[in-house]
Amino acid sequence: DGHMSMLLAAAQIIKEQQLVKRGKLKTLFQPAEELGSGATSMIRGGAIDDVEYIFGAHVRPFEEAENGQASPAIHYASSCRMVIAFHGKPAHGARPHLGINALDAAVQAVNAVNAIHLKPTDNYSVKATRFLCDSGVTNAIPAEAVVTWDLRAQYNKTMDELCAKFLPAIEGAAASIGATVEIRDSFRIPAAELHDEATALLAESISAVLGESNCVEPIYTPGGEDFFFYTIEKPSLKAGFFGLGCNLRPGLHHPDMSFD
């Protein structure tokens, strides 16, 4: 609601003061950012077909930018959700040798993924965030387990490398005890690809409006943002993304979040 209100108010001021002297300005009220599907729906609707520059904004917690400050660039990371089902073979708990324990396969896979290492200078993480396994009773070998992983990487190339190691790790771990794997869900959001010219324009604008001292350093965050599907779909776009300080406390997505 805050972001929509900001853009609506800015659009009203731009129109009333007739600030657009040449060209055309579009204001994109994009839905479903948190689901990761909003930008792609706008693309399918033709919203960026005739666009050369595209700018996004996101409010920032007070630790990153105080009220009245803004950053000309937010370097969002790539994020990926992987939901993997492990299939074994059911058996009675008294006869485990007749079954294949899907829970064991999933545990092996979690440990295998935790052993993935990329270059220490790369900013990345991969961790299991959900583990579901229930045969319905406590004296049976479970035939299925489902694990969800959250993958993060600051750059798209790093995410490519992480994904390339992830799947062989889980497949090998499961195969080591005779289990198989099934990808139930996979969804990836690209990392930021910001254009130098667009970022420079934002820095110039922030300095002009808020003062040069209130134009803070670029922000690097492990969070994801589906805005960057725009540049994936249309590489010629000059994209910029700025962060706005607004006394946001105690933090983004907190149930008690407030901002000015």
Name each model feature, range by range.
Residues 103-260:
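Metal-dependent amide/peptide-bond hydrolase catalytic core
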Residues 4-8, 14-15, 19-142, 224:
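Histidine/acidic-residue-rich, glycine-tolerant segments that coordinate divalent metal ions
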Residues 1:
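Active-site cofactor/substrate anionic-group-binding motifs, chiefly glycine-
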